[in-house]
Amino acid sequence: MTVETGGTGVTVTTVLGPVPVEELGVTLCHEHLRNDGALAWHPAPEGDTEGELIAGSPVRMEFLGRLRNDPYLSRDNVSLDDTGVAIEEVARFAARGGRSVLEVTPDGLGRAPAELAAIARATGLNIVMGCGFYLERTHPEWVRGMSVADVATEIERDLTEGVDGVRAGVIGEIGVSPDFTAEEEKVLRAAARAQARTRVPLSVHLPGWVRHGHRVLDVIAEEGGLIEATVLSHLNPSGRDRDYQVALATRGAYLGYDMCGMDYLYPAEGQSPCDEDNAAAIAWLHRAGLGHRVLLSQDVFLKTMLVRYGGTGYAHILTHFVPRLHRHGLTPADTTRLLVDNPRDLFLAFAASGNRHTSHTNDTL
């Protein structure tokens, strides 16, 4: 179990051990510090000389324009593979008053437990490691032959025993693709079962331009998971679909506005909304009385998202997005709720649910 009740209250398991939930402070709820996105990379079209150069070269300034419109063209761009750079970059967040990061790189995407611990020691940040499995194309081969119960056991093992001595403290990001395949549903069901038994938050990757949120919540509820401890990630692209987002929040889910600062066209999916649209959507949710269901982050997962390579980095929300929210009418107390209170309450959700939540999973599948 990674959220524990002791004499001082609820604690959250970080890569360096448990910390009181009250010490999470300003928290980014969906980030990547180390990853390997090799399976997202695609080669350049035949005859595209510039594309071939970009695909096989280290990221550099003259590539940025094209990579904003095709970020997976560069093999180098899709991996965060330098711990020293990660320390340098996330230290900017710490210097602005940041305290905690939910690092939701799952197994199969280059999760690096020992490196996360090194980053935590170097920066003083609370880093909470994720677990589980992402989109089907990234699932390790051994997962494909497993049952729901078997996958749930694997997830629970990362939470209770750890990986190389480092325990996960959150489940996710669990991958759901536009096709929402049977394998992805299997893993989601397993994640919900593991959540019910370990009582930790669950973070689900949604394809932001497709409306799978309700189906995801239905699966979680069927397996005994707690919707109030579930984050639906990548809600920025549906920010103008207010009926959809209100319905998800009303069911109790957290809405992950975790694409702040992105300026990318994902060719197979869509264009990331700009920060002005993100801020307007969040301000509307706040006025609708749903600000307590919103979580913020930047989902840094490409080299070009790092400051070193011309991106906005991990401190973007504190440096630029919070002032933008204030211009949209939110107060400092409101943005504190988004960045401090809501992440804390996510980890308190099981305690708050009390006897209302009981696991009713089917362990025979």
Regions found by a protein language model. Name each.
Residues S100, A118-A122, N126-P201, Y254, ...:
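Active-site gating/metal-coordination segments in enzymes
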Residues G37-L39, P113, H212-D218, D241-L248, ...:
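Histidine/acidic-residue-rich catalytic or RNA/ligand-binding cores of hydrolases
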Residues A114-A117, W142, T181-K186, W209-G224, ...:
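Distinct, well-ordered alpha-helical segments
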Residues C29, P43-T105, L109-T123, D150-V166:
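Alpha-helical scaffold segments that flank or form the walls of functional sites
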Residues S203, Y257-M259, L290-G311, T335:
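Short acidic/histidine-rich active-site segments
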Residues H32-D81, C131-A149, D299-V307, G311-V322:
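Active-site gating loops and adjacent loop-to-helix segments of metal-dependent hydrolytic enzymes
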Residues V3-P18, E22, H316-L365:
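Mid-to-C-terminal alpha-helical segments outside catalytic/metal-binding sites
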Residues H30, V101, F133, Q195, ...:
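Divalent metal-coordination and catalytic microenvironments
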